[in-house]
A protein has these predicted regions:
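Conserved ABC ATPase "signature" region
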Residues: 64-69, 112-129, 180-181
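Internal alpha/beta loop-helix hairpins
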Residues: 184, 194-264
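ABC ATPase NBD coupling module
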Residues: 66-83, 107-115
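Conserved ABC ATPase signature
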Residues: 133-137, 141
């Protein structure tokens, strides 16, 4: 893709963590890199930024080659048009918010910097904090300031290293929503490193699973979360299918909402959902009950018709992971081996997936 960040990097043996990673992202994409501590996630970002110089391979951003060891090309960090938000945000204690952003606007005439800095602060909802220093800002406000400074350089890619690690869960949710809204206004890809799979579920279009510097799996989030052959991901984040749905209808009287996706309609608690929105949906594998005939007299709303498209036994837990094709979407269900035998579950067999409304996660 011409407007993409494309990465093909190998880190030499003297690097802290050897890497063998390929990654691509287009404008407004969020490419997540997920893995445990020590997987090489930060080393990968530092390699993209030119801060880790023991790399071989190729990095191209919007047609500009940043790294190509075969041709002897390795641009220094200041020549790579990128924004980098580190885990500690890297803020200066003596500067207020406005000056943090203004010093990153050296490419603009001096008389334009203040107004542009104010505009960027407003973009991240910090317009009323322009005169405040980092010590007086909350963790979430510090993160917003770091992002405003990072995008002030008008970068071609934004690199985020565990951007939500220093905030509580409620603040994390709010910042995720803000970043999701912001990415639609930025004509650039975002590479997001995280050890919390909720960040992937709520923000990412694609994910690369990284372990000890090597790619375990990579692809669209919906594709990766619906695979039956990734016990590593199940152990790290729990099994559950992720897909996008539209809020088709909200019933104010019953306090329920209809979510439409290519496999049908799901009924969920309405909460703050509004009609016409697109939302990310996660269905935990443990919350799906399988049936071969339509049951009666149940309280649950959601019965989806599908077909068994995959089976995998988890030797460690003793459960069987069943992949169900519902339209173009694939769900995962965890059942016992006994259930597989009793229901004669086999690839290609029609199956019903029963899901409680309150078990469906909507973000």
């Amino acid at each position: 893709m011409s407007d993409a960040v494309s990465i093909d990097v190998r880190v030499r043996a003297d690097a802290p963590i050897p890497l063998d990673v390929a990654l691509a992202a287009g404008p407004r994409d969020v490419a997540a890199v997920f893995g445990p501590s020590g997987a090489g996630k930060t080393t990968l970002l530092r390699t993209i930024a030119g801060l880790h110089r023991q790399a071989t391979g190729r990095i191209v951003c919007r047609g500009v080659t940043w790294l190509d060891t075969d041709r002897g090309v390795c641009l220094p960090p200041h020549e790579r048009r990128l924004g980098f938000v580190a885990q500690d945000y890297g803020l200066f204690p003596h500067l207020d918010a406005l000056h943090h952003v203004a010093i990153a606007l050296g490419h603009l005439p001096r008389d334009q910097r203040r107004a542009e800095a104010a505009r960027l602060l407003a973009l991240v909802h910090l317009e009323s904090s322009a005169s405040r220093r980092p010590a007086s800002l909350s963790g979430g406000e510090q993160q917003r300031l770091a992002i405003a400074r990072a995008i002030a350089r008008n970068p071609h890619v934004l690199l985020l290293d565990e951007p939500f690690a220093a905030v509580d869960r409620a603040t994390r949710r709010a910042l995720q929503d803000e970043l999701d809204a912001l990415r639609h206004r930025l004509d650039m890809p975002i590479v997001l490193v995280t050890h919390d799979f909720e960040d992937v579920i709520r923000l990412a279009s694609h994910v690369t699973l990284l372990e000890r510097g090597h790619v375990v799996a990579a692809g669209a989030v919906g594709e990766i979360t619906s695979r039956v052959d990734l016990p590593w991901l199940a152990a790290a984040a729990g099994r559950g299918s992720v897909f996008t749905a539209s809020v088709d209808r909200v019933d104010e009287r019953r306090k329920l909402a209809d979510l439409r996706f290519d496999g049908g309609t799901l009924i969920v608690p309405a909460g703050s959902l509004t009609s016409g929105r697109y939302v990310r949906v996660r269905v935990p594998a443990r919350e799906i009950i399988l049936a071969t005939s339509r049951p009666e007299g149940l309280s649950l709303h959601n019965i989806l018709e599908g077909r068994v498209s995959g089976l995998e036994s988890d030797e460690r837990s003793g459960v069987v992971i069943v992949q169900i094709a519902v339209g173009e979407t694939h769900l995962l269900a965890e059942v016992t081996g006994d259930a597989v035998d009793r229901l004669a579950i086999a690839i290609g067999r029609p199956i019903l997936a029963l899901i409680k409304s309150v078990a469906i996660e909507v973000g």
